[in-house]
């Protein structure tokens, strides 16, 4: 956990050719500076990936060691207000300590599943009480996964609210999400092997969700 941001840095550079502290548009730099000052946080490390898939994501421990990564697709597909809305969403994750919160929360189902596996690793030597504990742990594991999904969705809503609050432009975020959804769908098939669109764990939108958006629109 302590070294995970540094490992992610290496993965981003090695597989996605991310460039950190790369020059970003002046309007975006000014926007990030303003949000950081208003929320008492350090200016994050900004990563840039030369990938046509529009995406952005945040990782790190706290708001003071956050990394925000954006792709070329974000800057090309969205207008200035929409780019600020997307980056505002990612800054919201950092301000609310979402990276740390979700990492700790996700340890619960891992622990419960570990208990279940221990209790059923050797059925011949397990007592009835051990098996009962294992069954209870597995049920709690299943329930905890749904709770994690709910928590994750709640954090996303909070990040959306933060973005709207700092940009004063709810339409920009809504339009950006639609454009990102369509952009991920149209670029997915032509993407190279190591494209950020292939990772659903990272990003403001995953490619599977974007396909649903296109079908519904």
Predicted regions, residues:
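Hydrophobic or amphipathic, alpha-helical segments that drive membrane association/targeting
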Residues: 1-55, 106-150, 181-185
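Active-site-proximal gating segments in proteases and membrane effectors
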Residues: 38-65, 163-217
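Short alpha-helix carrying the canonical HExxH Zn2+-binding catalytic motif
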Residues: 69, 79-95, 100
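An active-site-proximal "capping" alpha-helix that borders the catalytic cofactor pocket
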Residues: 32-36, 152-169
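Alpha-helix N-cap and coil->helix boundary residues
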Residues: 27, 82, 103, 154, ...
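Divalent metal-coordination and catalytic microenvironments
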Residues: 9, 32, 70, 89, ...
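Active-site scaffold of zinc-dependent metalloenzymes
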Residues: 56-80
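Catalytic Zn2+-binding segment of zinc metalloproteases
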Residues: 91-110, 170-171
């Amino acid at each position: 956990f302590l070294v995970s941001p540094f490992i992610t840095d290496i993965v981003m550079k090695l597989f996605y050719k991310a460039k950190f502290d790369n020059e970003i548009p002046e309007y975006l730099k000014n926007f990030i500076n303003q949000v950081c000052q208003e929320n008492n946080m350090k200016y994050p490390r900004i990563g840039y990936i030369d990938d046509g898939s529009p995406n952005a994501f945040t990782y790190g421990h706290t708001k003071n060691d956050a990394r925000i990564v954006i792709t070329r697709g974000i800057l090309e597909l969205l207008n200035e207000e929409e780019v600020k809305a997307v980056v505002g969403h990612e800054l919201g994750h950092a301000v609310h300590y979402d990276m740390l919160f979700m990492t700790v929360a996700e340890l619960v189902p891992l622990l419960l599943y570990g208990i279940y596996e221990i209790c059923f690793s050797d059925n011949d030597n397990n007592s009835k009480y051990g098996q009962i504990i294992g069954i209870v742990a597995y049920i709690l594991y299943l329930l905890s996964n749904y709770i994690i999904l709910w928590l994750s969705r709640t954090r996303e809503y909070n990040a959306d609210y933060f973005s709207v609050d700092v940009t004063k432009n709810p339409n920009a975020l809504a339009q950006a999400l639609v454009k990102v959804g369509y952009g991920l769908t149209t670029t997915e098939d032509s993407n190279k092997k190591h494209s950020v669109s292939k990772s659903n764990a990272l990003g403001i939108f995953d490619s599977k969700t974007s396909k649903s958006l296109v079908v519904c629109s």
